[in-house]
A protein has these predicted regions:
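Surface loops at the rim/top face of extracytoplasmic beta-rich domains
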Residues: 127-128
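Non-heme Fe(II)-dependent double-stranded beta-helix
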Residues: 1-13, 19-123
Length: 128
């Protein structure tokens, strides 16, 4: 992976796609823990932590917030592989916030309008 090229594309386009960043066992570990979290933890969460396109249809789960309540995801945000990639692309030190998960189930009609993440984060300086 050429991080200089990724950084140049990020600077030019404002985003990058990193293909095959997680593969094999690393991917399986995350996939299995997301499935476990959805199955075992989500039913215990209070309001505002899990969002569905249609509340009565679990397969329409579209967003999870506050995932640091789970030890796997709390520890995972310190994964050096992610941090090193972010720092290489952004060109500055990064601090991983609380893990969140976003999904667009097939045939989802919910659109995410343009927005500024720092409206919620309130970082100063606003490096998000």
């Amino acid at each position: 992976m050429d991080t200089d090229e990724l950084r140049a594309r990020f600077d030019r386009d404002g985003f990058v796609i990193v293909r095959d960043f997680l593969t094999g066992q690393a991917f399986e570990e995350v996939r299995e823990n997301v499935e476990r979290y959805v199955r075992d933890v989500v039913p215990t969460l209070g309001p505002g932590k899990a969002y569905y396109q249609e509340k009565d249809r679990p397969e329409t789960l579209k967003q999870l917030q506050g995932m640091a309540v789970d030890p796997f995801f709390e520890a995972y945000r310190q994964n050096r592989r992610w941090i090193d990639l972010a720092e290489a692309i952004l060109g500055e030190p990064v601090e991983a916030g609380e893990p969140e998960w976003f999904n667009k189930p097939p045939k989802t009609e919910h659109v995410t309008p343009p927005h500024q993440d720092n409206y919620s984060f309130n970082l100063n300086p606003p490096n998000v």
